[in-house]
Amino acid sequence: MKRDKLYEDILRPLLFTLEPEDAHELVHGMMRRFGGMLATFPYRYTGTDLRTNVAGTVFDNPVGLAAGFDKNADLIGVLRHVGFGFAEVGSITARASQGNPRPRLFRLAEDQALINRLGLNGEGAAAVAKRLSSIHASLPIAVNIAKTHDPAIAGDAAVEDILTSFRAIKHLDLSYVALNVSCPNTREGCMKERQELSIILSEMQKLNERGLPLFVKISPDSSDELIYDVVQVATECRLSGYICGNTTVTRDGLTTHANKLAEIGAGGLSGPPLTKLALSTCKKIAGLKAPAQNVIAVGGIRSGADAYRFIRAGASAIELYTGLIFVGPSLPKLICDELSELLRHDGITLEQAIGADLK
């Protein structure tokens, strides 16, 4: 795959002189202020061969922005200029939160990976919903919902907390809404009880008068038993699909020195070290899901070849985050270019490629 020389040789070295979260905030600010200029760069894939239908919405291409990058929907007016086919905003929570104390975002340059323990920081569901309703999105938008980062919110209060967020956004024109049950960076962790998940999803569907497609986000660290339970509940509750997956709490296969990892401490790992685990989880979910359900894959994807492997494993679309940090803003188009070439080489369409390795 080609390189983004401007980013890798000039911009990335400058950004990497800053603390990771400071660099992220600088990039956000520049995109908000000068995002219109991105339209003059050759970042968009203009072919029609990569269009894909996910839960009733047609994406121009299957490469999306993963939740976590644009937590508060600040960038939805410019993301199309960077080549994305869709974007997932959030995670949003019912209440605004500062998240965990800094430092909470760390680069593993040797592994081209990140560790984060941001802790669901964000402006809150009401503020994000207001912004989404007032700005014209340049591409299909989804929203990721999580429980507010507060261990005191549990049981019925946790259900109501999630429903509060859903009520705030359910009137919006969204391609889907994802329930995040997989955040590793809060003290209470993720929802693991089948009954708890069933109650939450059932209550969301009761409020879902407009029939917004609902997805559930599953951790790549999930056991086979948990994956089976989540898929069963999601099918019973008439969900449209799955986001597979999130960061991992494991540290397998890293070249970063153990002393540095110990110094960093807890957090979710993202980037290429996660790819094998995420691909395995994708295959498991795709093999269990109902035929009408979709899988959107995320986890260490940074090339068209990576995307192709996930698509052949059952994903209808893929999402990026960490790859953007290390490869640059041209990554969505670079992936689309290579993916299109791989499909032509194999003589199949994108639709035919979805789940090809499961047949």
Regions found by a protein language model. Name each.
Residues 99-112, 252-267, 324-348:
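C-terminal helical cap(s) of enzyme catalytic domains, especially alpha/beta-barrels
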Residues 67-70, 144-147, 218-224, 294-305:
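Glycine-rich beta-to-alpha transition loops that act as phosphate-gripper elements at the mouths
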Residues 83-97, 183, 241-251, 300-301, ...:
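Glycine-rich phosphate-binding active-site loops on the catalytic face of alpha/beta enzymes
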Residues 72-81, 222-236, 286-287, 291, ...:
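Catalytic cores of alpha/beta
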Residues 28, 32-45, 181-196, 233-291:
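Glycine/Thr-rich beta-alpha phosphate-binding loop at enzyme active sites
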Residues 90-140:
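A gly/proline- and charged-residue-enriched helix-loop-helix capping module
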Residues 149-163, 190, 216-236:
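Active-site glycine- and acidic-residue-rich loops that bind
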Residues 95-104, 125-126, 133-134, 185-210, ...:
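Active-site-adjacent beta->alpha loops and helix N-cap segments on the catalytic face
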